Swiss-Prot record:
Belongs to the mTERF family. This is Transcription termination factor 2, mitochondrial. It is found in: Mitochondrion matrix, Mitochondrion nucleoid. Monomer. Residues 1-35 form a transit peptide.
Length: 385
């Protein structure tokens, strides 16, 4: 039925267009109602739609994304657009922001100005602020718990986090800032105590904590009980305080995202796959903490991918860090090494392992050895007269 109505409206529009003697100078206002039923458009706030249209906003995108904002009686299109323009956004940027985050128009201007001042605490200038808003409009226009947000920003600054890191957390981990500041302080204290209890020093603890929060701020959404249970379980598995400290240093807060059950499953899988003793398994885990972090299905997929490439269990055991690579990355790197005549299954996996930058550096060295001339063609020859 809907497609018939749409077809009929399109044909009527075409007939009326043919009757026109000359095309209109401006796009008709009713054109913004394309692809909507008469019933839906009759409920929309026409003043809101008209103001959005004046801002060059694609109304169809808003209808698809958050059509409910067009039904609201009270909206602030002009006010929000003015605030964005004051920060340096041009007409195109304003339109893009409103299209990506339509709920911005139902935010009260006073609350948006408060949010603006809050984010300016960690932005060098308005140019940097508007760039952040353009990239993450949803985070900026999540207007709630502003007092909590402000207190948390100040708390993270006192801890020593740089403003550039805090601004990144505001956009990527906004839930952390909606936490009561006392809860975040409690979690930070527990993290500090956990690090010190396994033998970490005060000086190293501060560096570790700042890296942890910048890499995995969601740790603050955990419960204190979960952190204690994870550490106690590792101790029950025979890990010493020093070994747990090593895991904390490598995995940062990701260790606390693991529950005892998932750790147990990963340990059992690795022990069975490598056919090793408890002591040997601990050494493997310390070399490659991913054996704890990744789930059994992920480890199994990566192990099978390596075996299909002709790599043996013994090679994987010697360089377990290769399990941090996805099967796709492994295949790509093996093809590149094969192009130089390097047979990975007959050699060491060190050249396959590492970050993208490390792999490219190793590949470059192998390539240089491959094409290096046997003698230096520009060196003078010692010729006896």
């Amino acid at each position: 039925m809907l497609w018939k109505l749409l077809l009929r409206s399109q044909s009527c529009r075409l007939c009326s267009f043919r009757k026109m003697r000359s095309p209109p100078k401006y796009r008709p206002f009713l054109a913004c109602f394309t692809y909507t039923t008469d019933r839906q458009s009759s409920k929309e706030n026409t003043r809101t739609v008209e103001k959005l249209y004046k801002c060059s906003v694609d109304i169809r995108k808003i209808r698809r994304l958050k059509g409910w904002v067009l039904l609201e009686d009270e909206t602030y299109v002009e006010e929000i657009a003015n605030i964005l323009q004051e920060l340096g956004a041009d007409e195109t940027a304003v339109a893009n922001i409103l299209e990506r985050c339509p709920e911005a128009i139902v935010c009260r201007p006073t609350a948006v100005n408060t949010q603006r001042k809050l984010w300016q605490l960690v932005c060098k200038n308005e140019e940097e602020l508007i760039k952040l808003i353009e990239q993450f409009p949803e985070s900026f226009f999540t207007i709630k718990d502003q007092e909590n947000q402000k207190l948390n920003v100040q708390f993270f600054q006192e801890l020593g986090l740089k403003n550039v890191v805090i601004s990144r957390l505001l956009t990527a981990a906004s839930n952390v800032f909606h936490n009561p500041v006392e809860k975040n302080k409690q979690m930070v204290r527990i993290l500090q105590e956990s690090y010190l209890n396994v033998g970490g020093s005060e000086a190293n603890m501060k560096v570790w904590l700042l890296k942890l929060l910048s890499q995995n701020p969601f740790i603050l959404l955990n419960s204190p009980t979960a952190i204690k249970e994870t550490l106690e379980f590792l101790q029950e598995q025979g890990f010493t305080s020093f070994e747990i400290l090593q895991l904390l240093s490598k995995l940062k807060g990701f260790l606390f995202q693991l529950c005892p059950r998932s750790i147990q499953n990963s340990i059992s899988f690795s022990k069975n796959a490598f056919k090793c003793t408890d002591h040997d398994l601990k050494q493997l885990v310390l070399k490659c903490p991913a054996l704890l972090y990744y789930s059994v299905p992920v480890l199994e997929e990566r192990m099978q991918g390596l075996l299909r490439e002709g790599i043996s269990i013994a090679q994987i055991r010697e360089t377990p860090m290769v399990l941090e690579l996805t099967p796709q990355i492994v295949q790509y790197r093996i093809r590149k090494l094969n192009s130089l005549g390097y047979r990975i299954k007959d050699g060491h996996l060190a050249n396959l392992n590492g970050s993208k930058k490390e792999f490219e550096a190793n590949f470059g060295k192998i390539q240089a050895k491959k094409v290096r001339p046997l003698f230096n063609p520009v060196a003078p020859l010692n010729v006896e007269e």
